[in-house]
A protein has these predicted regions:
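Short acidic-hydrophobic, aromatic-tinged amphipathic segments that line or gate anion-handling sites
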Residues: 202-209
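N-terminal helical cap/lid subdomain that shapes the substrate entry/recognition surface
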Residues: 2-9, 13-92, 100
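Phosphate- and divalent-cation-binding pockets in alpha/beta enzyme and binding domains
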Residues: 23, 52, 114-117, 171, ...
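Substrate-recognition/cap helix-loop segment adjacent to the acidic, metal-dependent catalytic center
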Residues: 29-31, 52-61, 98-105, 109-139, ...
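Surface-exposed amphipathic alpha-helices with a cationic face
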Residues: 91-98, 169-173
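Acidic, Mg2+-coordinating phosphoryl-transfer loop and its flanking beta/alpha structural elements
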Residues: 160-202
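Short amphipathic alpha-helix with an adjacent loop that forms part of the alpha/beta core around
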Residues: 210-219
Length: 219
């Protein structure tokens, strides 16, 4: 029986992938004078804020000189232009899911540096029963899903994850959690083949399809 739903952020609750990419590119340019290609930035996704920034600048993620504060300033500066609002119906969906008696979580590759500003801007503060963030050393979503199970006292088949990336599908399969492949973002078409090859349990191309599926799974 479904008891909890955990959401990814970037490309799932908001079309924020371009925001993230451009914030990393602009920060790298301002700090080092080098403008990395979007593909270089995307190739580092999966690890968290400090990991990506360190990779672009040739620095360790735990280097005290890593300009993480500068990155956050750039991220927030670009936010209202590149990703001003969440996907239509996202906030209402979170509230509706909670009203059904389900636990609602957020599991994102972001760290608090960028997760917190986006949650606040999108009016989602207080809507998550659990917030789990990424690590700068490796993609840890499978570990975080296990942590969510322990925190909520739930089995893998009682939790559903909603995420857009091919690696999200891999990590869910690894720990036995069902996944809805969120294929409604601007980057979904580019990743469609990779996502389908990993056999997600469900794949939706419109956010409006999410609630009806959840209702069906609860019946």
């Amino acid at each position: 029986m479904l008891k909890g739903i955990i959401f990814d952020m970037d490309g799932t609750l908001g079309d924020t992938v371009t925001l993230c990419v451009e914030a990393y590119r602009q920060t790298t340019l301002e700090v080092s004078g080098r403008l990395p290609a979007a593909e270089e930035v995307l190739g580092l996704f999966g690890i968290s804020d400090r990991g990506v920034l360190g990779g672009l600048l040739g620095m360790r993620y735990d280097d005290p000189a890593l300009p993480i504060d500068h990155f956050v300033e750039v991220y927030e500066r670009l936010h209202d232009t590149l990703a001003p609002t969440p996907y239509e119906g996202a906030v209402e969906a979170l509230r509706s899911i909670k009203a059904k008696g389900l636990k609602v979580g957020l599991l994102t590759g972001k760290e608090h540096y960028t997760a917190d500003p986006t949650i606040a801007r999108y009016g989602m503060s207080g809507l998550f029963d659990l917030v789990l963030t990424g690590k700068p050393t490796h993609n840890c979503k499978d570990e975080c899903l296990l942590e969510a199970m322990r925190a909520w006292g739930m089995a893998a088949d009682e939790i559903l994850y909603v995420g857009d990336a091919p690696t999200d599908i891999e990590h869910c399969h690894r720990v036995g959690v069902r996944i809805i492949n969120a294929a409604w973002g601007s980057h979904a078409a580019a990743e469609a083949e990779a996502c389908l090859a990993r056999n997600p349990d469900y794949r939706l191309t419109r956010f409006s399809e999410l609630e009806p599926l959840i209702t069906k799974l609860l019946s």
